[in-house]
From Swiss-Prot:
Ligand binding (S-adenosyl-L-methionine): G36, G37, H38, D61, F88, D114, Q121
Protein name: Ribosomal RNA small subunit methyltransferase H
UniProt keyword Methyltransferase present: yes
Localization terms from the record: Cytoplasm
Group of enzyme by EC: transferase
UniProt cross-references to Pfam families, sorted A to Z: Methyltransf_5
Role of this protein: Specifically methylates the N4 position of cytidine in position 1402 (C1402) of 16S rRNA.
InterPro entries hit by this protein: RsmH, SAM-dep_MeTrfase_MraW_recog, SAM-dependent_MTases_sf
GO BP field: rRNA base methylation
Molecular function GO terms recorded: rRNA (cytosine-N4-)-methyltransferase activity
Family: Belongs to the methyltransferase superfamily. RsmH family.
Catalysed reactions listed for this entry: cytidine(1402) in 16S rRNA + S-adenosyl-L-methionine = N(4)-methylcytidine(1402) in 16S rRNA + S-adenosyl-L-homocysteine + H(+)
Length: 327
């Protein structure tokens, strides 16, 4: 897949998302706008299908740089696309507001969530997301948020740090790394840079490949903790489904097992029917599920896409469709 000319990073599983979501006119919501790559592809598909008239794409992001980049691209579709600053946990309110202002029904035809950190954010050392670049221990998706990675590393005790590294990073050496962080704080004072943290992890986990894996897990864990990503994901799944129209679809791209597991379990739980107590033998369920999985299992990137865009290697796409069941 060639690099998209209108995105500041390669949008992952682009064709798979468009094929699953674009099926007619209506309200389309990109809850993780980023550079606008997915949104632009959706708009082009709507245009080529003759569905642009009567459609609106709402792109949501809390990153000011992303909004600036994507907003300039969405301007190519005046009146049909809008970039909105906000956290995607407010997806229903933000999308409904924009739809009503444009005279559309506040029910979404499709919702897309591309989770995780964009390549642009990782590449910017001052954002503090990567152990490969020296920068401040920040890791905030929303630069106006109060808590940084440095705050957590310097304020939490050993038990709290170990819990963060284990729960959010699934790091097997979580306790040893937490002890090393506390020791470094006592010896050298507060941690301030990504290099400080990377050096601590390397002092505990030896060997190039093991240390790289642990570095990835520890930095992931801190990013999730700083941005409360799993709590937010649970809310955005519930909020997103609530604003979906009957027959509307929600597509979620995740990049690590914690996110994918949460999405899989949520879709499965919402697809179950309530047949009442065992032994009653009802002919019809008391209530039907609100979702039907469109993808039986997670969709992964092709070998060709992974070759062109290595970031797609860990991506998993799950899609579900809203039914007429009672939520």
């Amino acid at each position: 897949m060639p690099r998209s000319p209108d995105s500041y990073h390669d949008p992952v599983l682009l064709h798979e998302c468009v094929d699953a979501l674009v099926r007619g006119p209506g309200l389309y919501v990109d809850g993780t706008l980023g550079g606008g790559g997915h949104s632009m592809a959706i708009l082009r598909a709507l245009e080529s299908g003759g569905w642009l008239e009567g459609s609106l794409l709402v792109g949501i992001d809390q990153d000011d740089e992303a909004l600036h980049e994507a907003g300039s691209r969405l301007a190519a579709y005046p009146g049909r696309a809008v970039a909105v600053k906000g956290n995607f946990q407010d997806i229903a309110r933000l999308a409904s507001r924009e739809a009503v202002q444009k005279g559309l029904e506040p029910r979404a035809r499709a919702i897309l969530l591309d989770l995780g950190v964009s390549s642009r954010q990782i590449d910017r050392a001052e954002r503090g997301f990567s152990y490969m670049r020296t920068g401040p221990l920040d890791m905030r998706m929303d630069s106006s948020a109060s808590t940084t990675a440095a705050d957590i590393l310097n304020d939490a005790d050993e038990r709290e740090l170990a819990a963060i590294f284990f729960r959010y990073g699934e790091e097997p050496r979580s306790r040893a790394i937490a002890r090393a962080v506390i020791a470094a704080r006592m010896k050298h004072g507060p941690l301030s840079s990504t290099e400080d943290l990377a050096d601590i992890v390397r002092s505990v986990v030896h060997g190039r490949q093991p240390s790289i894996r642990s570095l990835s897990r520890v930095f992931q864990a801190l990013r999730i903790a700083v941005n409360r990503e799993l709590d937010v994901l649970q809310r955005v799944l519930e909020d997103g489904v609530s604003v979906l129209d009957e027959g509307g679809r929600i597509a979620v791209i995740s990049y690590h097992s914690l996110e994918d597991r949460m999405v899989k379990q949520y879709f499965a739980a919402q697809s179950k029917c309530d047949w009442g107590p065992k032994g009653v033998g009802l002919r019809e369920p008391l209530s039907r599920g609100t979702l039907v999985p469109v993808t039986r299992k997670a969709v992964v990137a092709s070998e060709d896409e992974v070759r062109v865009n290595p970031r797609s290697r860990s991506a998993k796409l799950r899609v579900a469709e809203k039914t007429g069941g009672v939520q």
